[in-house]
Amino acid sequence: MKIAKHILPIIALSAITASCGSQKVAVPETQKVTTTTTTTTTTTKTTTTTTTTTKAAPTTAQVSHVAKIANSFGAWTTLKAGGSVSIGGSKPLSSSMQIRMERGKSIYISVRPMGIMEVARLVIVGDTLLVIDKLHKRYILESAKLLTSGIPIDVSTLQDIFLGRAFILGNGTLNSGMASLVTLANIDGTYMVRPKEQYKGFEYDFKFDKNYHIKSLEVTPVVKSEKVATYSVDYSGVKTSLAGYIATKVNMATKIGKSPMSLALDYSGFTWNERVTIDAKIPSNYTRVSGSSLLGIFSEE
């Protein structure tokens, strides 16, 4: 059994979150006003320069559109879903999977070919990644930033990406009170939402259709190089659920190393706010391997 056929798509999707970092770079959205005050004494002349920054207030229309987008994201505490995952390429591969989430706490992905036997498991708790390879009895236990080329990531951002929800890095899921933190542009009937504060080295934005259904997430490195990749996620099949709008189909294109990678996720159903079990235990007879072995574990051997 080739684990690459089943688990690598999930790893690729997590890698979307390479945009998440610890250093913010503000996009110019402000006006600077400089005032100078001069104080003179018999011996000393002091000049003090003070710079104040004023953020441009969002328009009424922008506030309205952002509120409609944000209000489409309903509240939830837990999630269980079935589905399938496939990799594009010369030989498309697919597998059934089960997904469980506890909001803001954990993600559990069980890879089950034919929907029967679990061959691999990926668990993220907080900012820690656990990958269990059941066929070869080995595991990886590392920081979740292993999936994002060393850039910090947390489980909440991953959950938003999996469900097709806009977010502002460092502030969480987009809500109606965040209109002043984003810019909104109507481009040929498509609403583009772009956080004013971008993270160092990357830029990201979200696009929604006229019904406020998410269409895409784009994460682009500021400086193009072989060490960083552009991540694009296309969403479709948006449906209304107990937790608001949810994209049931997710299609991602990126790179793993220098190799192009495409991914399709198709959710078959959602169950909300019921008790879920997240198994993050490591079997006692399994061998730990280093994070640098990640792609080697899930190779085509």
Regions flagged by a language model, labelled:
Residues 106-160:
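An acidic-aromatic
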Residues 144, 148-183:
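C-terminal low-complexity, charged extensions that often adopt amphipathic alpha-helices
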Residues 21-94, 291-301:
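N-terminal leader/targeting segments and the immediate start of mature chains
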Residues 78-83, 94-96, 111, 122-126, ...:
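Extended beta-sheet lipid-handling architectures
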Residues 5, 22-26, 174-287:
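Gly/Pro-enriched, hydrophobic low-complexity segments
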Residues 89-116:
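Structural recognition of beta-strand segments within beta-rich domains
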Residues 1-8:
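Bacterial N-terminal signal peptides that target proteins for export
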Residues 16-19:
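C-terminal motif of bacterial Sec signal peptides marking the signal peptidase cleavage site
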